[in-house]
Amino acid sequence: MTFNPGKKLYISDVTLRDGSHAIRHQYSIQNVQDIARALDKARVDSIEVTHGDGLQGSSFNYGFGAHSDLEWIEAAADVIQHARVTVLLVPGIGTVHDLKAAYDAGARSVRVATHCTEADVSRQHIEYARELGMDTVGFLMMSHMIPAEQLAAQGKLMETYGAQCIYMADSGGAMNMNDIRDRMRAFKAVLNPQTQTGMHAHHNLSLGVANSIIAVEEGCDRIDASLAGMGAGAGNAPLEVFIAAAERLGWNHGTDLYTLMDAADDIVRPLQDRPVRVDRETLGLGYAGVYSSFLRHAEVAAAKYGLKTLDILVELGRRRMVGGQEDMIVDVALDLLAARKEQQA
């Protein structure tokens, strides 16, 4: 395909959803409005707002939010004039009833997210989103875990259900530029020309921006990113960094770089109780291909049982645990503890 550098990129901010993982889902209403207002001023195309694990993610398994999804959505919608309010919905966590409530609260776009091999569970939610008239996205998580052609086939399923855009989500921050190129080409080979594609990167191997650039060069229409990289693990592709790189490449992104830079440093970074960066633990996520939002849960388990967070994460990767299996983190920690005691006996 021919790359068109003048094509308007759709910039999708995830600070208020994926970024929620970084502070254990404790955004205040004021935080949400400050961030949403700045993003809207910078003219991003969409602002995703929910618990980090999507609609109804607030739970014992994933962590309780400081507010309900609807409170966060309404708070953002009250101050946004340009961008679409977007929500994440994981079938099995959120329901179509939750989606209708989110729509009534102001959401106009939804990403229906499944594990990369489970697109078939998204049908009901995608079809209902289209009935509501929402911009509807199929979102394939942990996309590094299956080959490109298999991933594309899962995306095609979501397209047949009515998804208008198909995303590859590098939830473990484990992919490199060749992985992205292969998967984006596979998408383009099977999806209808009018179906858009999207890239959701994590920065665990410091490749979030590079991978997003490669995706665009392969025809990707939508790019996820977050202010100061605020997100699970080492964070997402930092929005202000991606936009600066896109600007230097002469791409049409439609946003104001300096407004994003100010928001990242003045509003978002001070909220981080644990720096969102590549370090021993977050690098372990990318190296082992582990779901990025496992990080904070693994840190709690490590502190409780006197283990290294990295050891827990690597074992989770070895067992090929995926999003939704947060309850297994304690099981893994107990197994590691038992193995250590056995060695010491």
UniProtKB/Swiss-Prot annotation:
Pathway: Xenobiotic degradation; toluene degradation. Gene3D superfamilies: 1.10.8.60, Aldolase class I. Its EC number is 4.1.3.39. Mn(2+) binds at residues 18, 200, 202. Keywords: Aromatic hydrocarbons catabolism, Lyase, Manganese, Metal-binding, Plasmid. The keyword Lyase applies. The record marks 17 as: Transition state stabilizer. GO terms for molecular function: 2-isopropylmalate synthase activity; 4-hydroxy-2-oxovalerate aldolase activity; manganese ion binding. SUPFAM superfamilies: Aldolase, post-HMGL domain-like. The keyword Lyase applies. Residues 9-261 form the Pyruvate carboxyltransferase domain. Substrate binds at residues 17-18, 171, 200, 291. It comes from the Bacteria. It catalyses: (S)-4-hydroxy-2-oxopentanoate = acetaldehyde + pyruvate. Belongs to the 4-hydroxy-2-oxovalerate aldolase family. This is 4-hydroxy-2-oxovalerate aldolase. It comes from Pseudomonas putida (Arthrobacter siderocapsulatus).
